[in-house]
Amino acid sequence: MDNPTDTAGKCPVAHGNKPRGPSNRDWWPNQLNVQILHHNSGRADPLGKDFDYAEEFKKLDLDALKKDLHALMTDSQDWWPADFGHYGGLFIRMAWHSAGTYRITDGRGGAGQGQQRFAPLNSWPDNANLDKARRLLWPIKQKYGNRISWADLLILTGNVALESMGFKTFGFAGGRADVWEPEELYWGPEGTWLGDERYSGERQLAEPLGAVQMGLIYVNPEGPNGNPDPVAAARDIRETFARMAMNDEETVALIAGGHTFGKTHGAGDPSFIGAEPEGGAIEDQGLGWKSSFGTGVGKDAITAGLEVTWSQTPTKWSNYFFENLFAYEWELTKSPAGAHQWRAKNAEASIPDAYEPGKKHVPTMLTTDLSLRFDPIYEKISRRFLENPDQFADAFARAWFKLTHRDMGPKVRYLGPEVPAEDLIWQDVIPAVDHPLVDDKDIAELKAKVLATGLTVQELVSTAWASASTFRGSDKRGGANGARIRLAPQKDWEANQPAQLAKVLGVLEGIQKDFNAAQTGAKKISLADLIVLAGAAGVEKAAAAGGNAVSVPLTPGRMDASEAQTDAHSFAPLEPRIDGFRNYVNGKRLQFMKPEEALVDRAQLLTLTGPEMTVLVGGLRVLKAGNPEHGVFTSRPETLTNDFFVNLLDVATQWVPATGKEGVYEGRDRKTGAAKWTGTRVDLIFGSHSQLRAFAEVYGQADAKQKFVKDFVAAWNKVMNADRFDLV
């Protein structure tokens, strides 16, 4: 894997030459950015709102496509020649780097949208010359058109590269629909490529970041900050791979497996390399990193500045990586480009040259390769793989599948004939529906039974929201399906009010048991469905109390996951530390976000628009579905009204910081000074931020009472069904 270091110090923002006035963000850099709620809204989609990628994919002749990809592997082009006559190593790196931006903290990044096509990823130093890989693929993409997305093609090509070199992959699933504009993510605080201002204390990597430097996928292959220390590098590897949801065995398998093929490129000084794609000339047509060193390609190529080939058979699956790693002692040296790398001591030249037949080189390794030998935990795993090649092959196949499919969500989203039959725990498995579902009559009766228990609107709504609002549109995890709110760790999360949650779940489980036992046939209701049903009943009751009769729909079909189907550790990153919808902040608040920023961030993960976020906050506040101390701007709590907006926007109220309470404000009567309300930054942002205030004014108007309830129910239902991919 190439990890170029040649553009350090350059600004990662591509600036145009044409003068322009400053943007709003230039004038007010601390302004809350709500535009992320409207990215990839469909207006930029050239395929139109009616295009169904899943249906198009079904028309794909996958065998024919793979045959064409196999042929491409050895169809070397003069403008970008194939190392060793085979593009396999290049395409593995392309697929790896497409998927490798995934981070478990917020589920963002990954291969699911084909973001490698866009800035900044297309111009990251770590992705140098992958523009050539995608350009090599264009004739095939052009041939198969909309039947294969770029997102799927990048991963499939990596699989075919492995298969063409003798490796048996675990499988492939299609279903990654392309997007048409770059995702606006927080990739770090740095303003220069390869900057590393993301650390504090004893090399504590800031959240939610998953790489050690700006523009890298994981780690610096020369070692931390270029220090060639394999043990120190192992610490960086362990941290960054863990943030991609990989354990130690998967980490070793991925590094060794990927480095069984191909080579890195450091034929000359990085100063010979030109601008990245986004900074290139218009005539370069999106190709960057043009090199003036020699021919600039093939034997003269410069990508990472490192010049390493790991295996005696770099176009064939083998165990040479581990054999070489343990067969030699290693001495520090430098590549022709001046980068730190390692050379085997007293070794014969056994590594083939990529372009000169018969020429051999001494085995070489990266600092991060040696980490697999000198870190004591990695070393044990590596020796086991050395002695058991079949275990290594299986571990790499599974880890590669996880790497390339981690952000796709549940298996119901997988498409194609190569989907593995085996269920894997990281897929957050949910049992298939195996019984008749409740009908409208049952739903009405169950709602009545729920309300007859005496559970309050607040308890019903809070529980349903806690269950569903874990959903992340980024990696399609979380949500109400599976009823994992009753399992560890979710049942113990502070934001979920564990004591109240246990009470509500106990009552609902009793209703579920009685209903299922009373059926003469096989009809059942899952607890997952019943939790959502109970929340709907609570919303209906609250709306009726405000004079609006509404029916909150329920589409049954959720099932209950078991503890055995749940990796509790992997759900820890889904725990809310700041949840603006519930006005919740705990002691482990996110240091890189203000509460209002965390609200927008959570809304984006829930795939909500600005108006949807606004109406949900207003409704949840008056229903007391969260922190009851602040933001409940109503004299009739648990009644679904637009009171939150009416009272927030009341010009007779003056807001002042509360004494001794950071982030809390008091709303006082302008004339008397009497305290009326207390609110948080999240509450007040809807009166302070000009765009959010515009949304709030719509819902605070005298004629908005019915619209508010209608829009709240629609947004509520969207969140309740966010993970129902079976309905799409």
Swiss-Prot record:
Its cofactor is heme b. Coiled coil: none annotated. GO terms for cellular component: cytosol. Binds 1 heme b (iron(II)-protoporphyrin IX) group per dimer. Formation of the three residue Trp-Tyr-Met cross-link is important for the catalase, but not the peroxidase activity of the enzyme. One of its GO terms (molecular function) is metal ion binding. Its EC number is 1.11.1.21. The active site is at residue 97. Keywords: Heme, Hydrogen peroxide, Iron, Metal-binding, Oxidoreductase, Peroxidase, Plasmid. It is an enzyme of class 1 (oxidoreductase). There is a cross-link at residues 218-244 (Tryptophyl-tyrosyl-methioninium (Tyr-Met) (with W-96)). Induction: Expression increases from exponential to early- and late-stationary phase. Induced by H(2)O(2). It catalyses: H2O2 + AH2 = A + 2 H2O; 2 H2O2 = O2 + 2 H2O. Residues 1-26 are annotated as: Disordered. Heme b binds at residue 259. GO terms for biological process: cellular response to hydrogen peroxide; hydrogen peroxide catabolic process. PANTHER family: CATALASE-PEROXIDASE (PTHR30555:SF0), HYDROPEROXIDASE I, BIFUNCTIONAL CATALASE-PEROXIDASE (PTHR30555). NCBIfam families: cat_per_HPI (TIGR00198), PRK15061.1 (NF011635). Belongs to the peroxidase family. Peroxidase/catalase subfamily. Homodimer or homotetramer. Bifunctional enzyme with both catalase and broad-spectrum peroxidase activity. Important for stationary phase survival. This is Catalase-peroxidase.
